[in-house]
Structures are given as C-alpha cells and as structure tokens.
Amino acid sequence: MQTWQLPEHIADVLPTNARQLESAREQLLALFRVHGYELVQPPLMEYAHSLLTHIDAGLSLKTILVTDRLSGRQLGIRADITPQVARIDAHLLSANQGINRLCYAGPVLHAQPDGLPNMREPLQAGAEMYGFADIRGDIELIDLMLKSMKIADMGKVLLSLGHIGIFRALSDAAHLDAGQSAALLALMQDKDTGSVEAQVKAWKLDGMWAKAFSLLPRLYGGREVLSDARGRLPDLSAVGGALDELQAVCDAFPDNEIHIDLSELRVDNYHTGLLYAAYAADFHDAVARGGRYDGLGGYFGRARPATGFSFDLRSFIGRLPAVERQPAVLVDAEDAEAAREAVEALREQGQCVVIDYGIGHNVSEELAGRLKKTDGVWQVVKR
C-alpha cells in the first residue's frame, strides 16, 4: 500500500476547490446570520449513546465507532449534525423557552458512502429552528434553503414537498402495528405500487384503508395534487391538517416550480411532518433536504417543535463559482528583513505578500507587483 493513498471514498480538497468551498461557506453563514441564525460548532466526536438516538436507528449504520483510550467508553464520529444541534437546544440552550435559530457548517463522516457522488466525508451545512410549531417556521426555512441554493449557483431549483404525517395518520387509523407500518413505509419509499397493494391485501385491511394506501403512490405531480388528495383520501383531521400545511407552503411560493409527492417518504427516521427538498439540473438526487422533526430533543431531555434543512456543500464543487487567488506582491529574499515593516503593513491591509526565494512559487501568475525600495521608500512596483 502506498503511503499517499487515502481510504476509499475519501478525498483531499486542493486549493482551487478549497477556495470555492470556503467562499461559499462564508456566504452561507452570512446569509444565515442576517436571518437570525446563530452559528454552533458541535464536536466531531461524542459518546456514542449521544449520537445514536433511539429515534433514528439507521444512523448507527452510518456512524464510525471507536474506543476512547481515556475512559474506555465507546465514541462515535458524527454522521449527522442535526441530532447534535437538538442536544444543544435541549441541554445547553434550555434557558431560552422561546425560539432558537441555529446554523452550522462542518464535516461529517460516514461508515459507507451514502449515494452519489459516493463521498464519505460530506461538508454538512444547514439551519434549524427550535420552539415554533407553526407552518410559518417551515416556510421560513424553505425560503432560506432556496436562497442557499442561489449562493451555490444551482440555477433553477424545483421545490419538492411531501408530508409523512399523512402516511402515519392512515397507519394509526388502520391500526397497523409498528412492524407493519415500517414494512409498508419501506415499500412506499421504493415506489413499489404493486407490492403495496399486495401487502395491504395480505393483511386483509378494511377496504377504505387498503384503497388509501394503494392511492398514496399515485398522488404526485403539481399543485393540483392537493385538491385531488382532498377528494380521494379518507376524511381524517390529521390528513386534512397535513394537506392544509402543504397548501400553505404552495401559497407562500407562487413563483416556484413545485412538485408534490404524498408517498415521497425518503426521510431520516426522526422526521415527523412536512418534508421539503430542492432539486437542480444535473444532480441525480436532491441537492438539499429538510423537514419537521418535532420531539427529537426529547432524547436529550427537552422535546420541542423543530424544523430545518441541510445539504452537502462538497457535492456542489462542480457548480460553485470560481474564486481566483488574489494577485501577490513579491519581495526578494535578500530584501525581506529590511522590508519587514512595509511587508507587514501590506498584509494588514489584506494584501498577499510572498517572499521570493528564487526557486519558483505557487502564487498566482498575475502578480500585483514587486516590493522595491525607491527613493528611500518601499513601494510596490508593477511589472
């Protein structure tokens, strides 16, 4: 094995792309900040029992576990920042009984690649709101998600909506047990309409519920899906409430192309209600995902309404605007000591100054000039 080789699906980010990522990260955090979202930086590693909440069993498959040499306890390297932020809201920011708006941008590590582009070290960025159950909170986060996609230069973005509350309301009304609900949810996620129909038939569900479950995978399309669903799904208050929330989101974004899919349930297990995602050209999957996950903080002692979104900033590298390196001022090595004061003054002004040792360098070919002493004064002389 070569000493320079990296693990599979792990990659370095070289200067050109690193500049793109850091520029986009700075712009995103600035965007979040002017919308009232405070930056938090959870640790890369925590005790495993804190990272692996019982709510999302699938997270354990993504999480790399190690033994802490100090305590002997099991540690986990985070695979998702959202549970960490829920812990912060529930425990460290518990003095605030009102709304907490929080954001983050940091690396996570996956035990296995999670879809394309097959990277195991995403740079997860996102924003979350805790303490507000109203649909207006979800609309605020969706608006912020769409603005984030503009910074990432995604071009025209399709907003996709779903609501897991509809499926769960039907499951409860049909008296499905946890195992049946999970099995049917998996079939819904696979869009396997035939298997859904066969499964509800095998369970001998009441005709109304069997028809409703078979109908869900067919309820997709534009905004008209909502009126169609109202006329064809059982008249349950929870179903009606979920459709009202979806309608409110559609009304809030009249100029956006919207796709609604009532069987789109590809969510982390902690999501509880409205689901939203952004799709862009040339990407095989959603470029950002979010939704409501009320109660996740209960695992850490304070269950609160919550909604938020996240995305992998590294997956956008091919679309991010180029960020040119600042032209440098060169100073000859033999002049460096004498010119130290002038060099530091330029650097304090934000100017890149590089000592030229005469053997080449990796600075931009477009130099700002060379620092020379003219008439007793150090000046930048253009080439």
Curated annotation (Swiss-Prot):
Protein keywords: Amino-acid biosynthesis, Cytoplasm, Histidine biosynthesis
Major subcellular site: cytoplasm
A Pfam family reported for this protein in Swiss-Prot or TrEMBL: tRNA-synt_His
Cellular localisation: Cytoplasm
Signal sequence range: none
Entry coiled-coil feature ranges: none
GO CC terms: cytoplasm
One GO MF term: histidine-tRNA ligase activity
InterPro entries according to UniProt: aa-tRNA-synth_II/BPL/LPL, HisRS-like_core, HisRS/HisZ, HisZ
Statement: the UniProt record of this protein carries the keyword Cytoplasm: yes
Annotated disulfide bonds: none
Pathway annotation: Amino-acid biosynthesis; L-histidine biosynthesis; L-histidine from 5-phospho-alpha-D-ribose 1-diphosphate: step 1/9
Transmembrane intervals: none
Presence of keyword Secreted: no
One BP term from GO: histidyl-tRNA aminoacylation
Extra information: This function is generally fulfilled by the C-terminal part of HisG, which is missing in some bacteria such as this one.
Function: Required for the first step of histidine biosynthesis. May allow the feedback regulation of ATP phosphoribosyltransferase activity by histidine.
Family (UniProt): Belongs to the class-II aminoacyl-tRNA synthetase family. HisZ subfamily.
Binding partners and assembly: Heteromultimer composed of HisG and HisZ subunits.
Name of the protein this chain belongs to: ATP phosphoribosyltransferase regulatory subunit
Gene designation: hisZ
